[in-house]
């Protein structure tokens, strides 16, 4: 396997997230305590880190028991820049811009944000006729939704070049007001018209439909103009600022296949994979091998917790299910995947520099140690060394926080089990977007 040429930045950029608690007045509710995650204005990488944290909160494969998130996200950002696991349908990239356009016509910062919330609630209501399972964000919560579409798509809009205004929605609203005031104080200039047309977003965005979002038949069907714009933006997106990772943007090649993909098709089976550049195919092969090899570590972790739970009233059938699943995985594991991870995981680690993810030496050491043990093949489930390695890793990550299920019975008592999931690098979102686009010629 040829060496992968990956742009490596000097130093690792850690995501500086802030968690705050404040009291705010909510119309109709009075004073409420709100807990929120924020990011540093003007730094898109911090925005992306917040949304990754939000996306991980409800996903089985993103619990971070074994600390593989930085490697996973490095692959995902490289293959599918601008996408996230909490996005649902492609047309939201335009819905959010249009809601912001409507809201930005207000004259004050707080008025803009209040109007944005109102328009997004109207959007939820307008789409609710589509029913469950169609990707409608907030269909159950409606106006009680805590994570609006603008929060979910904000970072992606920047990555795709569809948002020019940097920073959070608050920073954007502040910028709209400031720009409008500047133009008003400049006699003889016609800049306000430009502000009114862009509002910090793509000046070439498709025109907002009349009466949006209050349309009786609003749905996720893209118009020809919307599909053309989105294809161009998705194809041009890149995970690093230097553009060296652009060759690994899978959407640029996958979108040339203008047919709907069947449900359940894996990333590895996309019909355009053979058309990828050689280096991209090699990187994709490494990502697949990493998924298959580390999947077993997730099963072993669950088997270990289930075994420790047995004297505490845990379910025997749960333990036996994990044990059987681990053996099935070990029997099917391909030695070629093990060797690929052992030989090339450092190259994947260098993606972290380019995509601004912190991949610690401890993470790479754990992956290498696990892969080395995987050479035992079908005998691995009986390996005490493998169980000890996985247990030590979880304790190292969670022990100080008091959430280690290996160490604490109290943490095990709150455990609901669940199946280990293979990493898919946001393929679920990409699969849906490709089908959204395939229906438009």
Predicted regions and their residues:
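Non-catalytic recognition/regulatory regions in large multidomain proteins
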Residues: 18, 22, 26-441
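Short polybasic linear motifs
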Residues: 15
């Amino acid at each position: 396997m040829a060496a992968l040429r990956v742009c490596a930045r000097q130093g690792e950029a850690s995501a500086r997230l802030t968690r705050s608690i404040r009291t705010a007045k909510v119309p109709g509710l009075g004073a409420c305590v709100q807990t929120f995650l924020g990011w540093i204005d003007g730094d898109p990488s911090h925005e992306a880190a917040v949304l990754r944290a939000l996306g991980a909160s409800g996903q089985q494969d993103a619990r971070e028991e074994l600390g593989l998130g930085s490697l996973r996200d490095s692959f995902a950002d490289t293959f599918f820049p601008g996408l996230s696991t909490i996005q649902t349908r492609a047309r939201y990239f335009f819905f959010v811009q249009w809601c912001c356009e409507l809201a930005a016509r207000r004259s004050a910062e707080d008025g803009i944000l209040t109007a944005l919330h109102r328009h997004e609630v109207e959007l939820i209501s307008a789409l609710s006729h589509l029913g469950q399972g169609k990707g409608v964000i907030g269909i159950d919560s409606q106006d009680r939704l805590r994570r609006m579409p603008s929060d979910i798509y904000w970072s992606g809009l920047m990555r795709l070049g569809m948002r020019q205004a940097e920073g959070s929605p608050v920073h954007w609203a502040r910028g709209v007001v400031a720009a409008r005031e500047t133009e008003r104080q400049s006699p003889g200039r016609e800049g306000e018209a430009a502000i009114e047309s862009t509002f910090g977003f793509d000046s070439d965005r498709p025109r907002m439909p009349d009466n949006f979002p209050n349309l009786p038949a609003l749905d996720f069907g893209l118009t020809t103009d919307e599909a053309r714009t989105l294809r161009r933006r998705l194809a041009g997106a890149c995970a690093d600022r230097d553009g060296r990772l652009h060759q690994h943007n899978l959407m640029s090649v996958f979108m040339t296949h203008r047919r709907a993909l069947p449900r359940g098709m894996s990333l590895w089976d996309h019909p355009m994979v053979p058309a990828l550049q050689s280096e991209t195919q090699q990187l994709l092969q490494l990502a697949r091998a990493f998924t298959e090899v580390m999947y077993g570590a997730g099963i072993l972790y669950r088997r270990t917790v289930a075994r420790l739970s047995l004297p505490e009233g845990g379910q025997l059938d749960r333990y036996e299910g994990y044990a059987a699943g681990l053996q099935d995985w070990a029997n099917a594991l391909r030695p070629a995947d093990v060797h690929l991870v052992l030989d090339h995981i450092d190259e994947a680690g260098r993606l972290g520099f380019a995509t601004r993810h912190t991949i610690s030496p401890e993470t790479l050491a754990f992956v290498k140690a696990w892969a080395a043990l995987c050479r035992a093949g079908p005998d691995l489930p009986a390996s005490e060394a493998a169980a000890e390695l996985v247990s030590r890793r979880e304790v190292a990550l969670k022990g100080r926080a008091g959430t280690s299920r290996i160490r604490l019975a109290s943490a095990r008592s709150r455990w609901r089990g669940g199946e280990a999931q293979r990493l898919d690098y946001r393929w679920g979102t990409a699969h849906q977007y490709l089908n959204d686009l395939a229906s438009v010629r």
